[in-house]
């Protein structure tokens, strides 16, 4: 990619919508990616000339020459409505809405529920004892003749394994990058790292090849990464020990015992539940106060107070990828890192599932070594005292829970088994009904006391890992409570003031500018985010202006030397949005969610400070890179190819929403806008914008070959599953 002239994205914030004056190819020739700043003219709707249509709210303003009059595409409003559950699912796709629980409400009949992805397996598998050994010197199979897998390598390759893929130039991308393929003869591109050699008895033996030079270049860049370049890998022995309750959580046990005693004492002291209805005598009150003091004395300080934890930093130059369920998988995060994303998070993991040792939940903690590197920050960044960039990471974990002990014990296990985490974030924003009904996610917004207990306990057991929290404006549209909640998160609630135990010690707060009720039906409320940013700034700089000296936090209990970072989240879709939020909302950084799924190069735009009109060829190369990362993560055997195809299709169900900016009449683009039927500047661009899931499968086959006969894919929405019409 040719170099881009770097422009400080914080210098100018456009105040008006702009008419897109970019030159656009009107024929079918490929439109090159624009690396120069798109020339734009500030106008108002009244100043529109030359018959250009006015911008209609909710509809992408596509230039007339790219509009298609008749198409099987869904209309903008319909497509917008049906895409809402997909956006919700990006926050918690593992917890689908339960049927029959929506009493008095209209069912979302456009959704495909209980989707089946079929299977992608060999007709008969190759025995593991043969998968990596030379043909004539295999390892011993412990099952012998009773083994249900194939033992003859040539028979397996000829009869049970599908033919090799011809994509990627016929070369296995894992072997090409690392000099060895961990899938041996089962690899769908095994021909690139397999050969025959002559033996002393005149036979020809199949063997696997390794490239020492490639292996040397592929050595991990961080010392604690695995041979495959992964960090935070939890061994099977550790997961089994957790599942069988053989792994103890001593810090959590001590803290939870103290919390239980403290809660009972506070309940008596604050609510007088130990008193009879006739009133209370002074002796009883004094006894209760003595009990509170006794609990204070019994409290054992955690090994690391918040002020003793690793310092972190968020700034304008650190755009952050939001935690995304399903979409936020490891290959996608790697892709975003390549485009300039500075911080990533795991998919949301349920605390109880981690405590139970569920393999699928612990697998979410795996990160690529590129996520274990320090973030790139400005040399003039206003970092907090004690911040050491060389000890910082890009990857953090997000967990959810409905009880304090779930979150606290899960945090202690994470800090012990996956120490290479930047932060552990508590999800208080997930809107999915099942998560909400269980009391987790956004349900915690209505229970601030419980939330504070969870965060305080997480801080007590997380060792050096800072604790952060992600919230919404509230659970209902007409009653936002984020300002009150933020004050509690920074200063501590009334109970903490009585016990004189300081604030809960969160290092950062992220606010999604929507309520739980709102979901994605309206634009994020950045004016409210700005109000909360101003509040946090006041709390950080002038705590004595908003509280009395009795509630002034103990300096020992403050994370980051007393600074709580604040991130805004919602509808960031371009460098224009990012700059506007940094300059006008006053947030430290912006967390990008759907905007990054639809166009991962939004991080590159933020870094360059300009729109980038990616050509269809460049976007296809991006999808190819995702395919390579997918095979590296899930495997290059039949099962791994099928898994990569499934997650690529899930991703393409978002990327098709992208309308190239060269086709737009006005800038900036809005993430909520849905386009009328349109055609691209060439056939490939049109294909990439197709809402038909069969076209998405066609795109995956460009890199992963024809789908397995048993593979299935049902799009999230029935509106995407139509037959092409002539």
UniProtKB/Swiss-Prot annotation:
Family affiliation: Belongs to the Dus family. Dus3 subfamily.
Location within or outside the cell: Cytoplasm; Nucleus
Keyword tRNA processing: yes
Compositional bias per record (Basic and acidic residues), positions renumbered to this chain: 28-38, 94-103, 113-124
Catalysed reaction, written as an equation: 5,6-dihydrouridine(47) in tRNA + NAD(+) = uridine(47) in tRNA + NADH + H(+); 5,6-dihydrouridine(47) in tRNA + NADP(+) = uridine(47) in tRNA + NADPH + H(+); a 5,6-dihydrouridine in mRNA + NAD(+) = a uridine in mRNA + NADH + H(+); a 5,6-dihydrouridine in mRNA + NADP(+) = a uridine in mRNA + NADPH + H(+)
Polar residues bias: start-end ranges: 1-10
Protein name, per record: tRNA-dihydrouridine(47) synthase [NAD(P)(+)]
Gene this chain is encoded by: dus3
GO cellular component: cytoplasm; nuclear periphery
